[in-house]
Amino acid sequence: MPQRHHQGHKRTPKQLALIIKRCLPMVLTGSGMLCTTANAEEYYFDPIMLETTKSGMQTTDLSRFSKKYAQLPGTYQVDIWLNKKKVSQKKITFTANAEQLLQPQFTVEQLRELGIKVDEIPALAEKDDDSVINSLEQIIPGTAAEFDFNHQRLNLSIPQIALYRDARGYVSPSRWDDGIPTLFTNYSFTGSDNRYRQGNRSQRQNLNMQNGANFGPWRLRNYSTWTRNDQTSSWNTISSYLQRDIKALKSQLLLGESATSGSIFSSYTFTGVQLASDDNMLPNSQRGFAPTVRGIANSSAIVTIRQNGYVIYQSNVPAGAFEINDLYPSSNSGDLEVTIEESDGTQRRFIQPYSSLPMMQRPGHLKYSATAGRYRADANSDSKEPEFAEATAIYGLNNTFTLYGGLLGSEDYYALGIGIGGTLGALGALSMDINRADTQFDNQHSFHGYQWRTQYIKDIPETNTNIAVSYYRYTNDGYFSFNEANTRNWDYNSRQKSEIQFNISQTIFDGVSLYASGSQQDYWGNNDKNRNISVGVSGQQWGVGYSLNYQYSRYTDQNNDRALSLNLSIPLERWLPRSRVSYQMTSQKDRPTQHEMRLDGSLLDDGRLSYSLEQSLDDDNNHNSSLNASYRSPYGTFSAGYSYGNDSSQYNYGVTGGVVIHPHGVTLSQYLGNAFALIDANGASGVRIQNYPGIATDPFGYAVVPYLTTYQENRLSVDTTQLPDNVDLEQTTQFVVPNRGAMVAARFNANIGYRVLVTVSDRNGKPLPFGALASNDETGQQSIVDEGGILYLSEISSKSQSWTVRWGNQADQQCQFAFSTPDSEPTTSVLQGTAQCH
């Protein structure tokens, strides 16, 4: 009988059924004798317990399974952990060593992917990439490999000297996936039907479409809209472009209609060509700014780095000089405290000054863009559309300074910008830049002017205060941005003279913070000023969120405006799962105070059905009530709602989603992100994907995971608790690394058919020998006979399947039988049956 080791944890019938579903295929098919549950319990056959008292029965030698982790050789889908860090998941072939323990085989190419210095190790450098290495320990001294079969985990320990040092979060470009060819469209359709007390009626529909085609690394995109109201309808193309990544440059090449980044000069739209660096192609730990930390360890030491009291980095370093250049900063400011703990326990500390601004780059990193083409005016404007060229660059000079600048030119316009940003240590971070622009208009009038910009940011960890200030100054009324220079009609009184912006946030204690922000603009030609000031407090206590906000606005062509708002949000989990009730009060100058109550929540097991009920009332007794709901299905998101007030009522409706055409057919999906995945479950329908509400394979076995992170490893896992009864999976997790805009394929080899416990007897009616091996003549599937002559079979359907059973090499030590399920739909997840073997 199977022996079970446990920790006193009682199982419900549902949990036991799940254990059978997970463990029997592994225990009885010859792919292994161990399985695991959520509590990491082990289930395995102890050969000592496998003796039988039934006369005439023979047993098969199963002594190899008496050793922990000793399993049948073969190919397994495993998680690979290198030096205690998970690096990948893939299929690895294992062979048995002299002790009958499994040892992994690697190809030279797989070793490269692990970061091993293949070209610097003579025994590997002379081999082809597809050469097989049976014992890595003999080639790289100090290497150890252990296969934890219970968790399908391969633990590798390889000396650091044999490995390249990659930044944290690094994913080898060899894993970046261009995806498979596809045509797709994203659509968002909304409509409303308004009816008024006077008898009037108005209807409106709107359709947004983002269309695309992928072939290899190339991405063709188009964005179009359609609108319709009671009188007119129109179709507009917003933009179209062709794009691909340039991996060697970590950049994107774009041909067509797009917009500049606005990093140096103001952003504008264009039709042309652009080559720009893409920081998404960098590891997470290399994006943005963080200083390089250098020091010296007297022995093998642990280096710990803290910022604002939090540990943001910890690593072991060998004796000698070390360099750390892959930090994840936790904020824009706050000095780094570096602690070196030597092997004898002694500690040394030093402070690395650190503050940052958005444009700052790491030492040695260059961020750039080069654009050329024709200026693209708005659809309804009367602007010029001259040809132009622009180049910008931002370079991290060292731990302290970042230099940046750019050039922009056309027939009647020229601009030059230069600047520097840097850390001031305990004083914060500061940047200063200047842009000069020369503009000539059609009437031959020429202008030139300067724009000065200063930005300052400072964190005060002792008081949890953050301060950010920006100041813009125009030396005269002759400075024009490229957008303004191409406008044929402009108002002198609207020429901006200066602008100041500030933002201050203050954490009082856990969960409560204050903020204040504001801006002021003044203009040439008049003394008027635009002002906007906001202050507020927000927090959370016992799950209840609250905020109080005040805003003051003053504009030259409008009256002053003041507004006060109070918000409360209370969870209702105790009475209504996944729901909240909220209250909002808004008081605005010259308007009646409004009160609003709202209930939001979601239903079904993964929250794919959401709803909201709202009631509002103001001091003039104007009221409005509304009910809205939306449902996220594998084929799109559907929404509908109804509202009514004193003078009108409204119906609204909508659907958003995607249509994907791929080499295997057409699949409907939820709204697609920049990169997405096609799930192929080998024809199995109803297979759900974890962490993606509403996503499940269609009747053809396909589904689309609508959004992925580009150039980073994405984990796609099947929700095994929701698997259909007639579906088994060879693996439940896949890792994909999509390029920008790619549709990558993730295949889950599903075995479709029911699970059956079959009692098999020989021609004389006696149970088959214990340990006999049964194999499916069509699929190659294998199973082992237990002590009662019972076989566990999967993938069984109403179509008869032929099985061969062997318990020796002689002709009289094998037989055959056929088995199928009844034509009627099974009512249990594990069926039972009998068969006679001839």
Describe each PLM feature range:
Residues 2-4, 8, 17-29, 37-287, ...:
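Post-signal-peptide, soluble extracytosolic/periplasmic N-terminal scaffold domains
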Residues 72-94, 683-693, 764-778:
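Short, ordered, surface-exposed loop/turn motifs in non-cytosolic proteins
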Residues 91-93, 694-702, 779-790:
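Short, acidic Ser/Thr/Gly-rich low-complexity loop/linker segments typical of extracellular
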Residues 98-106, 327-333, 702-724, 728, ...:
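Short Pro-Gly-centered beta-turn/loop motif in secreted/extracellular proteins
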Residues 162, 191-195, 217, 226-230, ...:
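Transmembrane beta-strands of outer-membrane beta-barrel pores
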Residues 176, 203-216, 236-249, 385-399, ...:
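Feature captures outer-membrane beta-barrel proteins of Gram-negative bacteria and organelles
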Residues 185-189, 222, 253-255, 368-372, ...:
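Membrane-embedded beta-strand positions of outer-membrane beta-barrel proteins
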Residues 295, 677-681, 754-762:
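A short, amphipathic beta-strand motif
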